Regions:
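Short loop/turn segments that flank or connect secondary-structure elements
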Residues: 1-225
């Protein structure tokens, strides 16, 4: 969860209910500079979606170059991507005519809105919702559990737990790698988390395999010094 999300987050239980109605105002797609994360799973499905629509995009690296921007999460070299924002109102780059142009493949953060999830380390999740845009909280009653069942897939759950479990070890290894090899390590990080994803094969299997490769490479580099 980003610092921006934490600022407006209110914790809820699976059985809690809130009022929520999408008004198609586009407000949640504006003023989003560096607030919409695009993890490797999001990037995989966005790339596949745009390719299948006939756009000239055939790999995750192309998507990231055109539609996302990197942000350093830690000085060790661990970085993430956020969707680019455009215009004076810092609107999401995929907002067209006040509508999401990638609705079928939008990032998990957008899919879960107004809710958010936070892995708790025990294999389950804590749930929160964002109070940032108060005019959204009217209309029909929405139960947390039902919303998650609809929008938080088993694949997303498995991926998020793996990210939570492995981020620490990866960051620790990056910290141990000497400065003169840091660029090499970061290139491996990007290659195995983003570049080496085949759009025509299942995501999760590739992700898990690549993560193991990355941990092995970084571990060897840390030992070699």
């Amino acid at each position: 969860m980003t610092e921006h999300e934490q600022k407006y987050a209110v914790r809820v239980t699976p059985s809690d209910k809130i009022r929520f109605r999408c008004t198609l105002c586009g407000a949640c797609c504006r003023n989003v500079k560096e607030t919409v994360p695009v993890d490797c799973k999001d990037a995989f499905y966005l790339t596949k979606h745009l390719r299948d629509l006939g756009m000239d995009i055939y790999c995750v690296d192309q998507l990231l170059e055109q539609y996302a921007e990197p942000a350093l999460l830690d000085e060790c070299g661990f970085f993430v991507y956020f969707l680019k924002s455009v215009g004076e109102d810092n609107a999401c780059i995929f907002l067209k005519d006040n509508r999401c142009s990638v609705q079928e493949a939008k990032p998990l953060a957008c899919r879960l809105y107004p809710f958010m999830v936070d892995p708790n380390g025990s294999g389950s999740f804590s749930y929160l919702y964002s109070t940032e845009r108060t005019h959204h909280f009217r209309g029909a009653v929405v139960e947390t559990r039902s919303w998650m069942k609809k929008h938080f897939s088993q694949e997303s759950r498995a991926f998020m737990q793996a990210e939570y479990t492995q981020a620490g070890p990866i960051a620790a290894l990056l910290m141990r790698i000497p400065e003169h090899r840091k660029t090499e390590a970061v290139l491996h990080f990007h290659r195995l988390r983003y570049s080496e994803l085949d759009l025509d094969k299942p995501f999760l299997e590739q992700y898990q395999r690549n993560q193991m490769k990355l941990l092995a490479i970084l571990s060897r580099m840390a030992e070699e010094g």
